[in-house]
Amino acid sequence: MPTETPNGHFAAGQLRAALWVMQYLATSEGQPPEGDAFRGKKVPARLLAAGLGSLMRNLLLTRRHGGDRWKAAVEVFHEIPDFLKAELPGTTMGSGEERAFVAGYEKQLAAYREKFGTLAG
């Protein structure tokens, strides 16, 4: 299994999963992207921009839901700094970087689904 690369593609994939789960906890809408959605000349910084931009809005929306949604959102929110490197990968991913990104994404999404069940999409 690919591991985190020096430029943070594995962590960027984990961050993408965390941002998607935060969005889902806030809205209960959509399906998580499949790993293949991140293949083919993608730039991690662009894949993460919308989720990072709406993170606080999603946190506030989830707060209004309260209960288990809020508890899950707090846990996910607390993990985000671990996935956020000093600089997001800003160039098109090569095949190894792509594999690391997808592996990080799939690993983290699976962990959230195991921990939060249907709340994680």
Language-model region placement:
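Intrinsic-disorder/low-complexity detector
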Residues: M1-G121
